[in-house]
Swiss-Prot record:
<dbReference type="Pfam" id="PF13374">
    <property type="entry name" value="TPR_10"/>
</dbReference>
<dbReference type="InterPro" id="IPR011990">
    <property type="entry name" value="TPR-like_helical_dom_sf"/>
</dbReference>
<feature type="region of interest" description="Important for interaction with NUMA1; INSC and FRMPD1">
    <location>
        <begin position="22"/>
        <end position="357"/>
    </location>
</feature>
<feature type="binding site">
    <location>
        <position position="608"/>
    </location>
    <ligand>
        <name>GDP</name>
    </ligand>
</feature>
<dbReference type="GO" id="GO:0000132">
    <property type="term" value="P:establishment of mitotic spindle orientation"/>
</dbReference>
<keyword id="KW-0547">Nucleotide-binding</keyword>
<feature type="domain" description="GoLoco 4">
    <location>
        <begin position="628"/>
        <end position="650"/>
    </location>
</feature>
<keyword id="KW-0813">Transport</keyword>
<dbReference type="GO" id="GO:0070840">
    <property type="term" value="F:dynein complex binding"/>
</dbReference>
<feature type="binding site">
    <location>
        <position position="642"/>
    </location>
    <ligand>
        <name>GDP</name>
    </ligand>
</feature>
<dbReference type="GO" id="GO:0001965">
    <property type="term" value="F:G-protein alpha-subunit binding"/>
</dbReference>
<dbReference type="GO" id="GO:0005938">
    <property type="term" value="C:cell cortex"/>
</dbReference>
<feature type="modified residue" description="Phosphothreonine">
    <location>
        <position position="486"/>
    </location>
</feature>
<dbReference type="GO" id="GO:0032991">
    <property type="term" value="C:protein-containing complex"/>
</dbReference>
<dbReference type="Pfam" id="PF13176">
    <property type="entry name" value="TPR_7"/>
</dbReference>
<dbReference type="GO" id="GO:0060236">
    <property type="term" value="P:regulation of mitotic spindle organization"/>
</dbReference>
<keyword id="KW-0498">Mitosis</keyword>
Length: 684
């Protein structure tokens, strides 16, 4: 009888465990199905439910971690993606799954790349590559090479965006990163060609062409994009075909073959309309407008820019609308229609002010100044002078769009300026601002505001008081003046480090302080007594060593809490059997821990700490109707050369070495430009 009861209990336990396992696996499979169908948000819910149920199967749990990380990546929740890929890496490493470790390292690298942590991403992707080569996994090796190319490509682009540099003109570190991307893409291309993977070849050709384009290797870019176009046509991939046409147009622009570029842009426009992608259609119109501007066919340029403007208004893209107004102003100026040019320059100024685009605002002011100089009008630096009796084509009518998301006219100028002109415009037109110089007396105020603390004076002693519950704290005037002799640079940085340590104590853990005279053992935001300081004693405290010991202990415990262990891996149900297996793997593994693996862990922990301590960088936003690969530099050079050809070489009077002012210079050039623009208008 007793044996039967024991047998029944074992059977019941087996069935319960089987049902739980089936439930976890079924939830995970449903989550995978939903993600594959494109509903990643619903898929995440099922994966999270599977984690809540838990499983003893370590490989199943690793697969769930990987899928969850990928789903969160697709949903742009990169912090969650990083967390689950990190769990996946830890678990794969623990159970000795090298293939899983390679894939997890690659996924971590892709996530870190998107977060802008390129050096950490390179370490992870290199780990992926090393393991794949060790296992002779050609497919994994190809993916790792492609990922490394992507990371170096993104790194180069991120460094190469400080200003309106010409394509191919980069600092040495940017060029090195882009060249490394080319090398990895070419290795990837050779490998996927040997494997016969045509789809992967298409991706490699596309990225290789884009990287050559950035490096200024436009012939190589054309060759790569032509191959990308052929493969896209093989697969019937209209979106990839459209991108290839657009990239070919961009490359031919910089090769000076504008007619060829216009043909590719027209094919891009046709495919965009077939795909019913209004934003891409607007981008194509914008590119065609600029191309016909370079061809000096201003009537066609205006036609395409008006189409771009109409779609930008339809899509509420203020960035694109401002860019269209800038282009239309240039085209109308070239035709000698200064009234229309004035109107669009004013619209450009209005939009630049609205979106807070200072460079675009300066450009619009310069355009208005030149136009008004030609028309003999006076120019006000404070208000835009709206031109009168200006009739606008009916196709421009539309609802005023909402505020755009990003600055569109970064560091842009319409024409080349003399140093004198730039200097005068900077001083006369731009708003005057006082330089922001941190005075010694302001350093404590800065730290004080940063920490949410304030100073209170009790006789001669200044003690940091807790002000965490108040919204704004201002220091009385009598307490703001602190001489530079009282607190020097070393004192300031010492005080800053103490404030930071106090902030860490408040937010992160409860310190078990040694030799502490306070009775309370709970976390307190009030600083210890060693933080007390008088104005007559040095800032450095005799208890610095004790404080640093406490700080090191706090940090080490916090890092230990964050590191993944088997007890805090979500979804892992440990039984006696699995616990013994894990213990055996941890204690009896004779293989020394790989330094690269720990390097990855440390870098990932650093990324997590950085994410927790500071706000993430602002998301890169862009106008949907403006192409990513814009060729403003070529347009500006063309405009500048045209202006230079029209201008006269002024003979400087020996007796007037510096009397010839900016006003005289602008007036002479404006009159000449007015005459020449009239001739061009007559020719057209």
């Amino acid at each position: 009888m007793e044996e039967n009861l024991i047998s029944m209990r074992e059977d019941h336990s087996f069935h319960v465990r089987y049902r739980m396992e089936a439930s976890c696996l079924e939830l995970a499979l449903e989550g995978e199905r939903l993600c594959k169908s494109g509903d990643c948000r619903a898929g995440v819910s099922f994966f999270e439910a599977a984690v809540q149920v838990g499983t003893e199967d370590l490989k199943t749990l690793s697969a769930i971690y990987s899928q969850l990380g990928n789903a969160y990546f697709y949903l742009h929740d990169y912090a969650k993606a990083l967390e689950y890929h990190h769990h996946d890496l830890t678990l794969a490493r623990t159970i000795g799954d090298q293939l899983g470790e390679a894939k997890a390292s690659g996924n971590l690298g892709n996530t870190l790349k998107v977060l802008g942590n390129f050096d950490e991403a390179i370490v992870c992707c290199q780990r992926h590559l090393d393991i794949s080569r060790e296992l002779n996994d050609k497919v994994g090796e190809a993916r790792a090479l492609y990922n490394l190319g992507n990371v170096y490509h993104a790194k180069g682009k991120s460094f190469g965006c400080p200003g309106p540099q010409d394509v191919g003109e980069f600092p040495e570190e940017v060029r090195d990163a882009l060249q490394a991307a080319v090398d990895f893409y070419e290795e990837n291309l050779s490998l996927v060609t040997a494997l016969g993977d045509r789809a992967a070849q298409g991706r490699a050709f596309g990225n290789l062409g884009n990287t050559h384009y950035l490096l200024g290797n436009f012939r190589d870019a054309v060759i790569a994009h032509e191959q990308r176009l052929l493969i896209a046509k093989e697969f019937g991939d209209k979106a990839a075909e459209r991108r290839a046409y657009s990239n070919l147009g961009n490359a031919y622009i910089f090769l000076g073959e504008f007619e060829t570029a216009s043909e590719y842009y027209k094919k891009t426009l046709l495919l965009a309309r077939q795909l019913k992608d209004r934003a891409v259609e607007a981008q194509s119109c914008y590119s065609l407008g600029n191309t016909y501007t370079l061809l000096q066919d201003y009537e066609k340029a205006i036609d395409y820019h008006l189409k771009h403007l109409a779609i930008a208004q339809e899509l509420n893209d203020r960035i694109g609308e401002g860019r269209a107004c800038w282009s239309l102003g240039n085209a109308y100026t070239a035709l000698g229609n200064h009234d229309q040019a004035m109107h669009f320059a004013e619209k450009h100024l209005e939009i630049s002010r609205e979106v807070g685009d200072k460079s675009g605002e300066l450009t619009a002011r310069l355009n208005l100044s030149d136009l008004q100089m030609v028309l003999g009008l006076s120019y006000s630096t404070n208000n835009s002078i709206m031109s009168e009796n200006t009739e606008i084509d009916s196709s421009l009518n539309g609802v005023r769009p909402k505020l755009g998301r990003r600055h569109s006219m970064e560091n842009m100028e319409l024409m080349k300026l003399t140093p004198e002109k730039v200097q005068n415009w900077n001083s006369e037109i731009l708003a005057k601002q006082k330089p922001l110089i941190a005075k010694p007396s302001a350093k404590l105020l800065f730290v004080n505001r940063l920490k949410g603390k304030k100073y209170k004076t009790n006789s001669s002693t200044k003690v940091l008081q807790d002000a965490s519950n108040s919204i704004d704290h201002r220091i009385p005037n009598s307490q703001r003046k602190i001489s530079a002799d009282t607190i020097g640079d070393e004192g300031f940085f010492d005080l800053l480090s103490r404030f930071q340590s106090n902030r860490m104590d408040d937010q992160r853990c409860c310190l078990q302080e040694k030799n502490c005279h306070t009775a309370s053992t709970t976390t307190s935001s009030t600083p210890p007594k060693m933080m007390l300081k008088t104005s007559s004693v040095p800032v450095v405290s005799p208890n610095t060593d004790e404080f640093l010991d406490l700080l090191a202990s706090s940090q080490s415990r916090r890092l230990d809490d964050q590191r993944a262990s088997f007890s805090n891996l979500p979804g892992l149900r440990l039984t006696q059997n699995s616990q013994s297996v894990l213990s055996h793997l941890m204690t009896n593994d004779n293989k020394e821990a790989d330094e690269d693996f720990f390097d990855i862990l440390v870098k990932c922990q650093g990324s997590r700490l950085d994410d927790q301590r500071c706000a993430p960088p602002p998301a890169t936003t862009k106008g949907p109707t403006v192409p990513d690969e814009d060729f403003f530099s070529l347009i500006l050079r063309s405009q500048g050369k045209r202006m230079d050809e029209q201008r006269v070489l002024l003979q400087r009077d020996q007796n007037r070495d510096t009397d010839f002012g900016l006003k005289d210079f602008l007036q002479n050039n404006a009159l000449l430009e007015f005459k020449n623009s009239g001739k061009k208008s007559a020719d057209h």
